[in-house]
Amino acid sequence: MSALCDPPGAPGPPGPAPATHGPAPLSAQELSQEIKAFLTGVDPILGHQLSAREHARCGLLLLRSLPPARAAVLDHLRGVFDESVRAHLAALDETPVAGPPHLRPPPPSHVPAGGPGLEDVVQEVQQVLSEFIRANPKAWAPVISAWSIDLMGQLSSTYSGQHQRVPHATGALNELLQLWMGCRATRTLMDIYVQCLSALIGSCPDACVDALLDTSVQHSPHFDWVVAHIGSSFPGTIISRVLSCGLKDFCVHGGAGGGAGSSGGSSSQTPSTDPFPGSPAIPAEKRVPKIASVVGILGHLASRHGDSIRRELLRMFHDSLAGGSGGRSGDPSLQATVPFLLQLAVMSPALLGTVSGELVDCLKPPAVLSQLQQHLQGFPREELDNMLNLAVHLVSQASGAGAYRLLQFLVDTAMPASVITTQGLAVPDTVREACDRLIQLLLLHLQKLVHHRGGSPGEGVLGPPPPPRLVPFLDALKNHVGELCGETLRLERKRFLWQHQLLGLLSVYTRPSCGPEALGHLLSRARSPEELSLATQLYAGLVVSLSGLLPLAFRSCLARVHAGTLQPPFTARFLRNLALLVGWEQQGGEGPAALGAHFGESASAHLSDLAPLLLHPEEEVAEAAASLLAICPFPSEALSPSQLLGLVRAGVHRFFASLRLHGPPGVASACQLLTRLSQTSPAGLKAVLQLLVEGALHRGNTELFGGQVDGDNETLSVVSASLASASLLDTNRRHTAAVPGPGGIWSVFHAGVIGRGLKPPKFVQSRNQQEVIYNTQSLLSLLVHCCSAPGGTECGECWGAPILSPEAAKAVAVTLVESVCPDAAGAELAWPPEEHARATVERDLRIGRRFREQPLLFELLKLVAAAPPALCYCSVLLRGLLAALLGHWEASRHPDTTHSPWHLEASCTLVAVMAEGSLLPPALGNMHEVFSQLAPFEVRLLLLSVWGFLREHGPLPQKFIFQSERGRFIRDFSREGGGEGGPHLAVLHSVLHRNIDRLGLFSGRFQAPSPSTLLRQGT
């Protein structure tokens, strides 16, 4: 009978059935009848065919009474559960399908969940098996767990895809779990297995876990819902036991000693041609049967129990290192742990992502690296190479924040000991060399992946191109481009070479995003030519792969600058490096010349974005922008008016700011920029000259050129007004019907307030005289460069002095008039009679006061006078200043002119300027040489003669003719009636005769030239 019940090779009976409250024990005759009924399916007494329900209960009776019949009974019960599942699915098929499973209506109440007549049988089976497990778990739990788990696998595979209510296993794990747990039969099997595992969890759960792994391998992926449910119920046990069973099976199938990726000795006979495979060359399911199941189970649990999986994997790793060196001796499981973990990580990106976050912390202690090195010493060279290849592949698949940390760890470990920055990191040389080799192989592997992302060359020719292959390691580094660039610029040996190469690969992989960003970081952080050369090398390596790299980098950096995300020191460094590159190109340097040329083109296309940087509040940024724009090539087409005016305004502002902060040595860049802008077009020249003159005469800049600044003028006026009890000006305004005009007497005599005395004295700020001279010379030098005629210096008599353009000088003259006396701008150039000065007293006083407060006006008049006939356009200023001086000398009661030093100097300068500008003949133009020797009334007489001459011979441009030999306009006074002086020269001679004792030697200077002399001067 035992032979009939137990299959060949089956284990012996686990023992007598437990005592229950069911039927009394059967006699031998009754037991024989039950066996016959079970085997034939016919009732031995009544002779009719047993129903499925009766047949199942007959088997349960035998299972209680005859333990050796368990194999046959359990096999028969498979059919019972199969019929119950079929009935359940048939009932679901009859129900209308509406929406997803969790929204579908329940089956009709008249249809039992387990099929007609089988629900109670399934419940009885669960009760019987539960009693067996509780009575003798060590004997029954392994058998029943294997039976239940295998039956669930068969049912899952059998009915997958055969019914419309059973979703496909791929991507429908939650729906499958809900469907099968809603079936009474499969839920009962799950409860039975959970009871078995609970009974053995404290002693030896390996049998249950082995059965789970075997079934998972055989019926995956239809069986995944079982694994997910059991793993969620027993995460700690399942994770540890699944890994333990997988490791044991890995050892049996060649893992211990076979290394990572070899099966016994087969790997050495057929080596893989690709040293860095995307997946193992031989399918892992064929080499190690259970490892695929381990990967699947842990993959399901990784989302909710990632911490437990990570702790268990790291525990296995540390335990293997603590067991001593690897190789052919020692515990096989310890020897195979590292290859096993590598293989798991290769097959499951989810597991790799789970561990990669703490992998660096796990390997950082020097003792761990030393133990790992000792552990791997006993492995053959071929197996070590295989594991190294797997490690390279795993690093390339690392993702998330752990990828950058892993890279830093590898680089720090591979660096020579003298350059390691981490304190206390003592790494053996063998470990250092291994990391060095790992990094080199990693870079080679990444290069292959990046440059072969689209598959084989012929792939996609006839159809759509294949999607690019993803490289998780490079994807994770996209957010660390700035850190990589900073590490590269440290120029530590080996490190910067590795990271520079990695930046190139990352730029090609993520094009076009990371390439411009990396180039921008290098340009904004490089502090020396050596560091700057890294940017040129990166560009040289990417120029073939990335088109438009430099314009993109330039635009991205400018966008960061204007958005305020690039700090001012980095902005200044970026602009200085650009200027250096463009300068190299203009000097014809080798190497980065092409880079400088391209950057020059990019900069010229963004002049409107660079111009505001000249106004940057940070001085170093503004100065760097000026250095770049000073040598940046302008576009081939003409600048638009808006671009030109924006550049000129910013350049002029930069000039005065540099002059204030750094003095003349700091304005070189601004001067060069403004000179180039003045040469772009006539409009540019006029704008530069106009803004320079206006800026120099502005109240905020007058003190740079020796001007007087009313520091507290407004404050003092307010105080004075508040203290005054009576104001003559206010009184007159109240008693007049209208506000007095600019020519009235009320606006002339305002030296003080009646009852309060004179106005408070002005608070004057002044600079050092030498500094004023330097500043003035810098401004005049810039104006001369801008006004210089294209021909340069062609006259030997000019002693190298540049020939100024009359049109440019005219622009300066017009700007002077508009700045000093705006209400007289555009006035007639003809000189009015002396009586006319009575109507312009206020204007003349204002002009005289401006000349006294701003000595720069005299220098600007000299500049204008050097390019006749431009001084004619300053006629209003000359009349006003001359009238103011006449009034002063008329009112002066001093015996000599030395008591009025400023007026004396102003008178001399005025006459000399008019002579230089050919407004006076030479005889009259030399009279200023004797002013210091005369009395004030005599100076007034001479100035009146000047006024009279100008009244008769007005300063009109039409009186000048162009002399091609000298390349300038001249005025021939001999052709004008009385142009040599005439009666006006007689006044000068009379003064000379009166002071012949002191001025006799000057008489030759005031003689009208002969016609022959004029002829020689004309030629």
UniProtKB/Swiss-Prot annotation:
Highest taxon above the source species: Eukaryota
GO cellular component, one term: integrator complex
UniProt-annotated stretches for the region Disordered: 1-26, 261-283
Topology term for the membrane: Multi-pass membrane protein
Entry keywords, A to Z: Acetylation, Cytoplasm, Membrane, Nucleus, Phosphoprotein, Transmembrane, Transmembrane helix
Bias (Pro residues): 8-17
One Pfam family in the UniProt entry: INTS5_N
One of the protein's GO biological processes: RNA polymerase II transcription initiation surveillance
Family statement drawn from the similarity comment of this UniProt entry: Belongs to the Integrator subunit 5 family.
Protein name per the record: Integrator complex subunit 5
Gene label: INTS5
